[in-house]
Amino acid sequence: MNDATRDENGHPAPSQPTRAGTVEAWDIARIMHAIPHRFPFLMVDRVIGVERDVSCVGVKNVSINEHYFQGHFPSMAVMPGVLIIESMAQTAAVLVVATLGDDAAGKLVYFMSVEGAKFRKPVVPGDQMHVHVRKERRRGNIWKFSAEAKVDGKVVAEASYAAMILDR
């Protein structure tokens, strides 16, 4: 890759699609370049693997310093299920950007629906949650995904959902 296809940190620019069949890791700077979410709502700390048009694995390090633990719940901190789902959606947004490459410029990924959400085990401070997202299908600007969140290799949550890719 030449310098024109790298960002200011020397990483492959998110506007460049990954080659089909290759798996890439993304650091937080590259994630923040790709999706608009910021503290306190950025729910992906790292991507350990993204395969264009197929799947993405994101990582969320769950810390007691997360703002939501002040109220959920003070005596027994548990990551809210809706934020686990949000982590899945943000990981899917990374997959969309990796897949679309330059065509992702000026687009946003809008969460449309969630189905079959199941929460198997609480996610607590100190956990490292791995979010596995797979693209199930794409029709025009509507994408469907399935996802599992895992801690220590065990499924803690799962869901299927749809997103719409629209201009900003």
What are these regions (language model features)?
Residues 1-35, 46-48, 72-78:
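Mixed-charge, low-complexity intrinsically disordered regions
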Residues 2, 48, 54-63, 69, ...:
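Terminal leader/tail segments of proteins
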Residues 2-4, 16-25, 92-130, 156-158, ...:
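Hydrophobic beta-strand-centered segment that forms part of the acyl-chain substrate-binding groove
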Residues 39-79, 84:
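Catalytic strand-loop segment that frames the active site of acyl-thioester-processing enzymes
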Residues 47, 113-152:
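Hydrophobic beta-sheet segments that form the core/acyl-binding groove
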Residues 64, 77, 150, 154-158:
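Hydrophobic small-molecule pocket/channel-lining residues, especially in calycin-type beta-barrels
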Residues 71-103:
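Helix-adjacent hinge/juxtasegments
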Residues 150, 162-166:
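Short beta-strand edge segments in extracellular beta-sheet folds
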